[in-house]
Amino acid sequence: MIKTILLISFILENIFDFILVKLNDNYVKKPLPENVRDVYDEEKYNKWINYRNDSKKFSCVQTLITALISLGLYIFNVHAKVFGLFGTGKIVSNILLILVFTLFSTLISIPFSYYSNFVIEEKYGFNKTTIKTFILDIVKEFLIGIVLMLILFLGVMFLFEKFHNLGILFTIAAVILFNVFVSLFSMTFLRIFNKFTPLEDGELRSSLTALCEKYNVKIKNIYVMDASKRTTRANAFCTGFGKKTISLDDNLVNNYSTDKIVAVFAHEFGHAKYKHVLKSMWFAFFRISILILSLGIILNFPVICQAFGFEDVNYFFAFSVLTMISWPISRIFDMASNKISRTFEYQADGFAANEGYGESLIGALKQLSKDALTNLNPHPFVVMLEYSHPTLSQRIDAIRNPKKK
């Protein structure tokens, strides 16, 4: 009975995802909002429609195949059968189980990643990744993911085993500290995949530095990241507690005018000025606490893991169960988190506009959307559930009419 309920929950989650795709599919046929109709000319508009259709079909096939594979693993108790093959201690067996299924998940994802990059993205001019970079990225992601997962998993297992129910509180604290650690060393992780070169002296660097000095914000350095070795898309970010590190994609530096780049940075600087990252972390900590409490409940009921063939509680599989039962709650958290994030985006846009970069930011956002073939007309319900940023039309309207927001 427990197994049936959990499997139904898993199936419903995937059906819900397909419903969202269908909603977007129907809504995209509506006329574009007036203030974004100049983003695509007829040729670019048709290219966007084709790109969207290809991406949608691929995403649906990927979701269906991975869901069927996962469903098969759950129905036939594959996790428990693999776990039973090891016949060693609890800790070693769990570590081996993590290694096996993380490797399995990685191998399953490789054909999809390859098709996405070297067929769809290549077809529409986005992909710049070589086979060598593609393979190296997979290896690096796998190794880093395994190390971080084992640290997190072994820590959680130790705390629950040592302190039992009280371990929930210690686990919440440990996972929060783990997330802070990952945030603090985000640049270190990025350097494993990308090369960062200091931005040369000139008009752009002077403009960025002047904005920071105006608000007494100290900078570690301003870097240009070699994003062009993987994609034609562009981005920028500002990170760090205390002294800030600014990173601009080389695609942004090479293909956008100085005023647009400064406008994009002013937006990112607005996030730093208003401490949006720190504020978002508090909500993330609350979410983590709820999920750990839910995990504690699962671990206190061995019958849940036993329904999938285990003799007792299995910590690794308990995380899988957590994803199956928590998706409705996660959707609610996602909706709240995205609402907060969209509010922060409006504030950051407003900061850039108040600095005199409103129209330059609009121009940059339009160019970014055009270059990335962004969906300019997503369904409002999908935006509410899944979009961390307002739509381009909403952002333009808010920049030009700030009193409406």
Question: Where do the language-model regions lie?
Answer:
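Polar-ligand-bearing catalytic/cofactor-coordination segments
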Residues: 3-313, 328, 332-405
